[in-house]
Amino acid sequence: MSRIVLRREGTVEFYAPDPRAYGSIYSAPVFYNPAMEKNRTLSVLFLKAYGATGLTVCEPLSGTGVRGIRYAVETGAVGRLILNDISREAVELIKKNLEVNGVDAEVYNEDANVLLHRLRDKCDVVDIDPFGSPAPFLQAGFRALREEGVICVTATDTAVLVGRYPKKCLRRYGAVMFKTPFYIEAGLRNLTGYVARVAASEDYGFEPLFAYWEGHYFRLCARAVRGARDADSNFNFIGYVEYKKPSRKVVRRPGERSLGPLWVGPMGDPILVNKMAEYGPYGDFLQLLSEEYSVAAPWFFKVPEFALGGVSRGIEEALNALKKGGIYAVRTHMAPDGFKTEVSAGEVERVLRIVI
């Protein structure tokens, strides 16, 4: 493949297809999306903050290999790197990029699931970053993990996960979804709940460490620990959210206006995310996530839901009013006018009416 350009992300240089030569990134023989640089940088910060060293890291859908190479160069955590792509041209480019950066790795040209099954019980970290849904790769991904490990997934089929295509969502993720003011968080929790159920089916306990939404994708990194008792505990955090405008509540059995099944437990580790913020960029974003993770409610509210006298207040005015009323509330990264709190919609409205 001759039509390539030298690019840079973080501290690594690598070759990727020249989008000008192919018309778009989607027409190139090897997929590389520069818009996902933030995803890759946050993933590097995550693995660095995770704190382990000598890890066996597998990226079964490598493309140019830049994610895995950045793990090896920038985290100090990787002892063995395994890169794979089903495309021969991608594998050639991966090898070239490894050479450019002086990184050693095992490189395979196989179907991702075939490789993951062959790596059974051998990986500490499996990072599944597909174009579209991670669902077809999750079972094999868990089987590749050791007794304790980390699984990371990206999902770009956000329209399916939030329920814009409800039948496809039901087929692919086994969840009933419909439009709500907090549909983005519901979509992220839909993905997380699905991954947790797959983890349980492979006898792994599951703990989300870092999860977020960014424009056109959801991202999740979670700890997995093998054991039937741990796997059973996953279902303590699987439930449904009943939405009857504007109220929300967690229920264990679905009703007519219920979303789910969803992950209704914690979405991340604030301590780990604060440590990520110490290592590099996106500090404000990570601080916001850390604050969000401190609120247990599996939803957020939007200020316009509480328009008083037909007038919708700004987010800062609403947060200040809630604080004066003794209610803890934080902003969410999922909506500019959104906030998370553990009190009911009725209590939010009552306080806003009194204070504003």
Swiss-Prot record:
Trm1 methyltransferase domain mapped to chain residues: 5-352
GO molecular function, one term: tRNA binding
Keyword terms: Methyltransferase, RNA-binding, S-adenosyl-L-methionine, Transferase, tRNA processing, tRNA-binding
Reactions the enzyme catalyzes: guanosine(26) in tRNA + 2 S-adenosyl-L-methionine = N(2)-dimethylguanosine(26) in tRNA + 2 S-adenosyl-L-homocysteine + 2 H(+)
PROSITE patterns per record: SAM_MT_TRM1
EC number from the UniProt entry: 2.1.1.216
Gene3D superfamilies assigned to the protein according to its UniProt record, in alphabetical order: N2,N2-dimethylguanosine tRNA methyltransferase, C-terminal domain, Vaccinia Virus protein VP39
Residues that, per the record, bind S-adenosyl-L-methionine: 40, 67, 85, 111-112
Role noted for this protein: Dimethylates a single guanine residue at position 26 of a number of tRNAs using S-adenosyl-L-methionine as donor of the methyl groups.
HAMAP family: tRNA_dimethyltr_TRM1
Protein name (database record): tRNA (guanine(26)-N(2))-dimethyltransferase
Organism: Pyrobaculum arsenaticum (strain DSM 13514 / JCM 11321 / PZ6)
